[in-house]
């Protein structure tokens, strides 16, 4: 019998109160006795820390600690240690008698968190003579020692031979070693296992029924059915793997779609850019050639325009020079014509003004006479009126006042005064001796003098009148002379006028002849100018024709030019029609090319599809009929492959069924036999012979024959009753009576033959059976057959997969052919449009060259035609003047006539000044008058007038004196005043007469004054008009003299000359303007050509540079394309017909899709981002290659046999479809039935209930106080029991859960549990978690601890219903049961030669009475368990070992004094060694 391992000792180093203390542990009970604070709990804490060095679990608290939680910062360990290195070490002797030292090194960590550092270690192979304290301390002297560090301990142990020291970095490794060496009862793999172990020790330490232990009894007592669970897990794992594989297939299908999308978009992205660059390269080359062609053409055009410009510039310069001369001549002719016209107008004005002046002079003379007469009468009227006024005044003065009128004296006094006033004549007449008496004499003298002055004045006035008329005629004659020959001196006018009149008579005859001469000269000059114009035109014509022609050849040339015009006109007309025909043909070619270019992409797509079909089928098709015939062959091939595939599938399913049948446990081919065997209490015959060898299998198979599937029962009579009404069984059911444990084949009489047996069933019934070729009797035979079937199934599966692949491939090929026929068959076998396009392009090039040549010829013909027309036009102007051109004497005749005209030129003024001479002739004699004599006469006349006025005044003054001579005698009348009434009356009458006379005189004077004013106004007006016209006439004479021409008949000639010059100037200007416009147009054309040439040169250089630059990149692109073999994918000819914008749009759209497609692939994303550089097209090829490489790396070479991703995608679709079908079938086979699950769980529950009953038998004798017995009740929960019933009998009602592909079996089980128990709240747990719990049988069970207490009978063990001692005893019993259960569960994991240590704790054992303690001792002895009890000093057990602990303080140094004693019933009680204090 294997001995159980025991804990030998516990060593504490540097704990609080213990410096180096070793407690030897008793084989049963070790008691720690001492008062409060003696160190009992510290010792137990050191033991527990060495067992479970997990700081997350350790929490040492007092039993009286209130409110303690696991979250407290101080777990109680820090305060039990001292500063420095501390140790807690267990010395163990296991079942193999191996000494194992396990423990932990502890050290306080500085800080307010009160943490402790723990390092577990183990020592193996340590000699028994070496105590743990010798290893952990170093003696310095007799009174001092020190604790060694862990490294020093390691070094010390490594120095010992055969000793192994191991330090652990994890608690799991530490516990794994302790489990393997038998120190702990269970392998503590996880924190959960350690927690269970710690809670168990904690429950034993503090005693009582722990609620934690009670709630977790299932976890402690019921072992995990790992086999069943693993079977479920394997099934679910297989299903999960199968479904994951299916999901992976779906993902792969989505990846396939992604791959297709990726390769499609990548192809679009790169191919569009590739073809765009190819198109652009071709376009750039064409443009470069076109630019070069245009460059050469422009250069030739520029040279031609430059030559043309030079010619036109030279001609324009000639015309400019001629225009200057013509403008000068024209301006001179215009000026001369203007002068002639001005002179004529002036002459007409002069004649008109002279007529007006003559008329005005006559009227003025008449008006002067009228005014003179009117003045005389006015003077007479004034004198008369004045005399009347004087008389009236005198009478009024006399009659003003009657007193005054009567006072004559006063009047005389007044007269006297007036007479005195008249005495002023004395001074006026220069007569100082004048007296009133001598006044008469002097009056006569002065009147005679007045008469003489008046006569002299009248004589001078008459002379003055004659002199005025003569002077006027002189002025008129002088003006005419000045008008004819400019101003002269007045004294020379007579001689000049007489010469003019005499010469005018002589030259008038010559002037009459000059008109005819001048007309003849004008005619000849006109003909001369026409001749000169004709010569100029002929010179221009010859210059334009580039050849000198004689006058005689012009008519012939005219006929030749007309003939040439006719022929060229026909040629131009025909050329127009021919050009239209060529243009129309060119448009037809372009239209045909456009149609073919639109059809080409469709044809290319059809060809690509046809090529793919040819590659897939390996055939070549030349017509649509061949395609349809091959499609019919595909249909036949598909039908044959489907038939063969279905046959292989049927055989495969048959083999699967046979394998399933042979795989039944016990060799039962019918599952009903197992149920019947269980029902009858028998065993299948195949189970009895399950171990038969492969060689004996044919014999026993033939021996039993049809009864090889019989049921062996102990007693047939007991079965007979159950056979009545039996329906659920095979058609033939064989029952054999016998003992299944000692069954043999002696029930038959058998004769063995060669490969056969004869079985004598009865005397009248024999059975002959040959050995089967494939024996199935016995496990070996079945396994052999299963292996054979598996091999055959593998070959059939491979063949089925191949056929399925071929069928799907054929179906896809059929679909491809169907799509091809539907979409492309109509255009596939038509002629190649690209070839026809190339031919049309060649034809179009030739046609364009023809059109260009025709345009050039037509342009030359047009130029010749225009030149001929211009020549004919010029000849049409020249031919009518051939006579003039031939007349060589014209210039001589003009000179001759010019000489004759010069002779008559002197008489030209007769025509110009004929009127002046006609007027001058009658009055030229007036020119004799001397203007200076007229001025002297005017002065004499003025002097005579002044003398006559002075004489008149003197005579008048003397007359006044003579008249008032009587008044001088009234000197004394002032004093004499008297009146006379008669005289007053007379005076009044005279006054009335005088007033009337005065009125008549006044009226006459006023009327005559008004008339005189009118006469004066008329006279002033006439004088003003006369003076104005005289001044104008003088101005006109002066202007005419300034003009310096004579208005004669040359006006017509001047106008004709000016008109001729104007026509020449206009023609010259018109030609010059034409040349200037042509020159400007030529310069503009040259500028345009120059700019165009520069632009063409720049564009050509840029394009050539671009072509050369792009060539390197394109070569790199082509090298990449050819090296990687992707040209077939990228060179999509149908894209060549799309524009650059369409290709760029296509590439951009594909780029957007690719960004989304490669968003999760960093490599492709980076390559794609790099490839977006438009200047580096090769990077797009690199991206395409990277995509291909990426897809190649993801091709399953074991499934897909190609390197081309496109072909791989096609094969992938076929293979994935086949795998999906196979995995779906496999999932249906893997799925376990719900009834099987219920049966497995029920059997497991029954087994565990039986085991718990066996454990209860060991607790029946346990008693504590009133507790007589302890037991465990195991019951199935009602909700779970209902679930099992439904799974076994009503599962078909819930097949919607178990047949769902979306749910695993665990999830379906959880859904069913929720459906059956809707009132239970599942919380946040997932269906998978709930299902996994429902697959664990432990969750179906409820466990309760019951005690048989006194008269109450069996009660549920609760701390409230038990005393403290009863609770502690009951709990300890349950814990012992748990430990034993753990050992039983772990026995298969640990070596069979090891029995683990058993040790529990009990603190504060004073709560138990002596009987209870004795019961614990008996329990420990019976179960071979060690127990450590902490008790106060009043407990002294009779058995085991007791340590008395006393804490003392010496010299401020605290230590625990320990004394150990054996039990009282020991034969020789003695103190245990090592009890001395080592503090």
Swiss-Prot record:
Coiled coil, from the record: 138-163, 331-664, 831-1112, 1206-1257
One Gene Ontology cellular component annotation held by this UniProt entry: nucleoid
Binding-site residues for ATP, renumbered to this chain: 34-41
Pfam families registered for this protein in UniProt: MukB, MukB_hinge, SbcC_Walker_B
Transmembrane segments: none
Ribosomal protein keyword on record: no
Complexes and interactors: Homodimerization via its hinge domain. Binds to DNA via its C-terminal region. Interacts, and probably forms a ternary complex, with MukE and MukF via its C-terminal region. The complex formation is stimulated by calcium or magnesium. Interacts with tubulin-related protein FtsZ.
NCBIfam families: PRK04863.1
The name this protein goes by in its record: Chromosome partition protein MukB
Lineage, broadest ranks: Bacteria, Pseudomonadati, Pseudomonadota, Gammaproteobacteria, Enterobacterales
Gene assigned in the entry: mukB
